């Protein structure tokens, strides 16, 4: 299968740079699958998972807090405020943050911004999915 260069960058650092066979991400208008030779594209992506298939066929998962995905001939770039490799996520911390977010929604006061609280919960759920998918991929390698 053909490969292309992918770079995933957060506000703090470069998370990934290398050759991949494909990537999957969630755009604002739905799921995206990018292969070599894809039509040029610039789109916003939602908080969630960017799944990479490396040139050796192995898969890797990266959590992104949202951002942009740009496709150019033979080069794809993902720009995100926050990006964390799945194997760097801490399941216990994610579950604790998810629980706090749920509690904040349940007990919110009149001045609390529901959309902000729901967004925080959504991001924690996306991190949890990235963590669980990474754990599943690691388990399947054994």
UniProtKB/Swiss-Prot annotation:
Subcellular location field: Cell inner membrane
One Pfam entry name: ATP-synt_DE_N
The protein's role, per its UniProt record: Produces ATP from ADP in the presence of a proton gradient across the membrane.
Protein species of origin: Pasteurella multocida (strain Pm70)
Assembly notes: F-type ATPases have 2 components, CF(1) - the catalytic core - and CF(0) - the membrane proton channel. CF(1) has five subunits: alpha(3), beta(3), gamma(1), delta(1), epsilon(1). CF(0) has three main subunits: a, b and c.
Protein name: ATP synthase epsilon chain
Predominant cellular place of this UniProt entry's protein: membrane
Keywords in alphabetical order: ATP synthesis, Cell inner membrane, Cell membrane, CF(1), Hydrogen ion transport, Ion transport, Membrane, Transport
One MF annotation (Gene Ontology) recorded for this entry: proton-transporting ATP synthase activity, rotational mechanism
A GO cellular component annotation in the UniProt record: plasma membrane
Membrane topology, record value: Peripheral membrane protein
Family: Belongs to the ATPase epsilon chain family.
């Amino acid at each position: 299968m053909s490969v292309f260069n992918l770079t995933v960058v957060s506000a703090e650092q470069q998370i990934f740079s290398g050759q991949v066979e494909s990537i999957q991400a969630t755009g604002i208008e739905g799921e995206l699958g990018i292969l070599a030779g894809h039509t040029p594209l610039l789109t916003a992506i939602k908080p969630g998972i960017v799944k990479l298939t490396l040139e050796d066929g192995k898969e890797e998962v990266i959590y992104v807090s949202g951002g942009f995905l740009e496709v150019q001939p033979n080069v794809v770039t993902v720009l995100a405020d926050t990006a964390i490799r799945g194997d760097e996520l801490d399941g216990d911390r994610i579950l604790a943050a998810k629980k706090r977010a749920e509690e904040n929604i349940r007990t919110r006061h009149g001045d609390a911004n529901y959309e902000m609280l729901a967004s925080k919960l959504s991001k924690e759920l996306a991190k949890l999915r990235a963590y669980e998918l990474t754990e599943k991929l690691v388990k399947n390698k054994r």
